Amino acid sequence: MRGFDKLDLESLPTPAYVVSLDLLEQNLNKLDDVQKRSGAEILLALKGFSAYSAFPLVRKYLRGTTSSGINEALLAREYFGGEIHVYNPAFTQSEISQLAEFAHTIVFNSQAQLDKFADFARSCAKA
């Protein structure tokens, strides 16, 4: 398997996630090229890739993360840094209170949720 020629895959405990940092960096270079040529900012979706041991490499190329809830957002804050964007279909007031302290963007699921939490989130962020 390309990128793993020096690794005895049969000796690894299972289940296990194995990441080739060389191949990951090749992909990150492609994403960086897209960012530079388009002006877009690409975020790491933690739902799809939350291997925090690779975050030091990934954060060299990507501006921040997108999280689908409080736990992923806390992971981003502790291990990734950068911009933290959060979406959740049903935030609680406690989650909004925490997220307002560090999240750069909170995306609400509906107008009703925005109406319910927007003023509270703003007040938490200013505190």
Residue ranges and their predicted role:
Residues 17-18, 28, 75:
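Generic preference for hydrophobic/aromatic residues in regular secondary structure cores
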Residues 6, 11, 31-36, 58, ...:
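Short, well-ordered helical secondary-structure segments
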Residues 2-4, 26-31, 35-49:
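N-terminal glycine-rich anion-binding loops that anchor highly charged ligand groups
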Residues 23:
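Active-site anion-handling motifs in enzyme catalytic cores
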Residues 1-18:
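Generic N-terminal amphipathic, Lys/Arg-enriched alpha-helix
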Residues 13, 18-19, 50, 92:
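Generic, ordered loop/turn and secondary-structure boundary motif
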Residues 16-19, 34, 42-44, 64:
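Broad hydrophobic/π-residue packing in well-ordered secondary structure
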Residues 40-127:
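Active-site-proximal beta-alpha core segment in soluble small-molecule metabolic enzymes
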